[in-house]
Amino acid sequence: MQADFGEYWMHRGDTRRVKVYFFASVMSHSRHKFTYFSKTPFTSELAIYAHQLAFRFYGGKPREVIYDQDRVFVRDENLGDVVLTKAFQAFVSSEHFQCVFCRKSDPQSKGKVENVVKYIKYNFLRGREFTNMEMLNESSVRWLARTANGLPHGTTKRIPAEAFKDEQPFLAPYVGTPAHPRDGMKEYLVRRDNTINFHSHFYNVPTGTYNGSGTFVWACAKEGHVEIYSNETGKQLVRHPLARIPGEAVLDETIRRTKLPS
């Protein structure tokens, strides 16, 4: 199985736009697809929940899952070996599947799911009006059955749902119950000096994050740290230790010197 994340601006009926974030997965042989949408960026815990939903959808677990080296999963890299986040390491250990992380210079090694992310954006989301997240996820299930998994695949020429009947018996049993996390993710206004006020403490974000009044990021407290995520991409921007002194400013000098990629 290959897995990845995406994001997309959707229109509401009142002419406003809303950013949605999604998890996508695809079975490598059959091209059987799954997706799950969220109103907030994916943390480790929310990504675990999306995996649980995918395993339930497929009726089993793959032996191997291929990913990018995303901060949702990877905390550090040591001599070429990735160090998983605490939550994701516990999940992988409990579910007994192997993680394979693409080298940063070789994203094509998970090209199947990158194509699925584009397919979701331009076949399912484009032109669709946003009502609420529950209806969006319900609509995606019908779209998966009718279109993504119900029509012949352009490369294999097989219908993914039919091809999956040959692949499904090789999956390991999944007996878990998906549980949505409560991580308290909220939006925070970015100040001109590229900081946010989080619980009366100031934390900096990469230079260039501020893009005029009305620039927001997502943030939550977790395991003694503040995790800050981009509103645009859903990717983690920085992870700070929680401040201990009221009004304290926590500044990471490395991101003060490094601008966001344009």
List each model region and its residues.
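Mobile-element integrase/transposase regions
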Residues: M1-F34, T43-L46, S93, M185-F198
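Active-site beta-loop-alpha junctions of metal-dependent nucleic acid enzymes
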Residues: Y36-K61, A243-G247
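Acidic/histidine-rich, metal-coordinating catalytic segments
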Residues: G60-G80
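RNase H-like two-metal-ion nuclease catalytic core shared by retroviral integrases
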Residues: Y67, N78-L79, C99-K121, L136
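Two-metal-ion acidic nuclease core segments, chiefly of the RNase H-like superfamily
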Residues: D81-C99
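Active-site-proximal acidic segments at structured loop/helix or strand boundaries
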Residues: V117-C220
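Protein C-terminal end segments and domain termini
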Residues: E223-S262
